[in-house]
């Protein structure tokens, strides 16, 4: 399955590939096979910034990266390296335990500063971005870590929660969060179900990828068909099958 997907996805979405005969094919994505960094960059281009008035940093999901880097071990290792280098942040989106959002650190910093500008919690947020963000790449933070290591008072932590920079994980523990991401999560969950339903309603519960992408998206698919298809493939919610007519998406047998 991985081998098939590795060859199918660049063919369908995105590599300008020169053949021995025939014209050069051009597709929306042009990621470099095997590079998580390139995959993240290309997927970021699909994020509809205008939908959120550019208030959110572009967000892609780990599952989407798997659609372009099908070897999950390689993808996870490369993402971990980017995380340790401070280039990306990974956040828990909350609607699923495996729902990890990936954001470029500089985009995150810029949008958060803009969102808190002039607010009562701006000082706490600036302190967090200057001290915690560069030093700790974790998805969550513990109370002793915040108070003893980074010197935050309880009131400052409350400010960070109010600002949407942290969300409560459990008593004395917080997830890193993206201010204002609730609307994105709502759109993502509804859009995923809608695109999955398009495949489910097709004859034999299968649909050519080219046909799916050529259809008019349902109103609830606010993030775009291509954005969601990468998720469905990478999350293994559909199987990819090579046919003479192109890549076929089929719901797995249950």
From Swiss-Prot:
* Gene Ontology MF annotations: ATP binding; double-stranded DNA binding; double-stranded RNA binding; kinase activity; protein homodimerization activity
Please give an example of a GO cellular component term from this record. Answer: nucleus
**According to the UniProt record, where is the region Winged helix domain 1?**
32-104
**Which parts of the sequence are annotated with region: Winged helix domain 3?**
180-254
Cite a single Pfam family from the UniProt record: Stk19
Q: InterPro entries this protein is in?
A: STK19-like
Cite the effect that the entry attributes to residue 250 to A. Answer: Increases cytoplasmic localization
What does the UniProt induction comment state? By ultraviolet radiation (at protein level).
Q: Where is this motif: Bipartite nuclear localization signal?
A: 4-21
Effect seen on changing residue 186 to N: Weakly impairs DNA repair
Where is region (Winged helix domain 2) located?
Answer: 120-179
Might you name a Gene Ontology BP term for this protein? positive regulation of Ras protein signal transduction
Effect upon mutating residue 204 to E: Reduces self-association and DNA-binding activity. Increases cytoplasmic localization
Disulfide bonds, paired cysteine numbers: none
- Outcome of residue 206 to K? Increases cytoplasmic localization
**Highest taxon, organism lineage:** Eukaryota
Q: Which keywords does the record carry?
A: Cytoplasm, DNA damage, DNA repair, DNA-binding, Nucleus, Repeat, RNA-binding
**Summary of subunit composition and partner proteins:** Monomer in solution. Homodimer; when bound to DNA. Component of a transcription-coupled nucleotide excision repair (TC-NER) complex composed of STK19, ERCC6, ERCC8, DDA1, DDB1, ELOF1 and UVSSA which assembles and interacts with the multiprotein RNA polymerase II complex when it stalls at DNA lesions.
Family stated for the protein in its record: Belongs to the STK19 family.
Question: Could you tell me what this protein does?
Answer: DNA-binding protein which is required for efficient transcription-coupled nucleotide excision repair (TC-NER). Acts as part of a TC-NER complex which assembles and interacts with RNA polymerase II (RNAPII) when it stalls at DNA lesions. TC-NER complex subunit UVSSA binds to the GTF2H1/p62 subunit of the TFIIH transcription factor complex, tethering TFIIH to the TC-NER complex. WHR1/STK19 then interacts with the XPD helicase subunit of TFIIH which guides TFIIH to DNA downstream of the stalled RNAPII, ensuring DNA repair. Directly interacts with RNAPII and also binds to downstream DNA.
PANTHER family the UniProt entry points to: SERINE/THREONINE-PROTEIN KINASE 19, SERINE_THREONINE-PROTEIN KINASE 19
What name goes with this protein? Winged helix repair factor 1
Name the source organism: Homo sapiens
């Amino acid at each position: 399955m991985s081998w098939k997907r590795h060859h199918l996805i660049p063919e369908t979405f995105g590599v300008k590939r020169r053949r021995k005969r025939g014209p050069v094919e051009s597709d929306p994505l042009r990621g470099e096979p095997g590079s998580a960094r390139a995959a993240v960059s290309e997927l970021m281009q699909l994020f509809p910034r205008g939908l959120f008035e550019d208030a959110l940093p572009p967000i892609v999901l780990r599952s989407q990266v798997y659609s372009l880097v099908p070897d999950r071990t390689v993808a996870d290792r490369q993402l971990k390296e980017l995380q340790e280098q401070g280039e990306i942040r990974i956040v828990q989106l909350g609607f699923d335990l495996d729902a990890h959002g990936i954001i470029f650190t500089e985009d995150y910093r810029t949008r958060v500063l803009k969102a808190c500008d002039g607010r009562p919690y701006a000082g706490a947020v600036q302190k967090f971005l200057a001290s915690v963000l560069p030093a700790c790449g974790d998805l969550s933070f513990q109370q002793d870590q915040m108070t003893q290591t980074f010197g935050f008072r309880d009131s400052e932590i409350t400010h960070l929660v109010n600002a949407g920079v942290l969300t409560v994980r459990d008593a004395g523990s917080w997830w890193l969060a993206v201010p204002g991401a609730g609307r994105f999560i709502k759109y993502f969950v509804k859009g995923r179900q809608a695109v999955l339903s398009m495949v489910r309603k097709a004859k034999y519960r299968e649909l050519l990828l080219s046909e799916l992408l050529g259809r008019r998206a349902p109103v609830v698919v606010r993030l775009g068909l291509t954005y969601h298809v990468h998720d469905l493939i990478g999350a293994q919610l559909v199987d990819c099958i090579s046919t003479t007519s192109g890549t076929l998406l089929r719901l797995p047998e249950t």
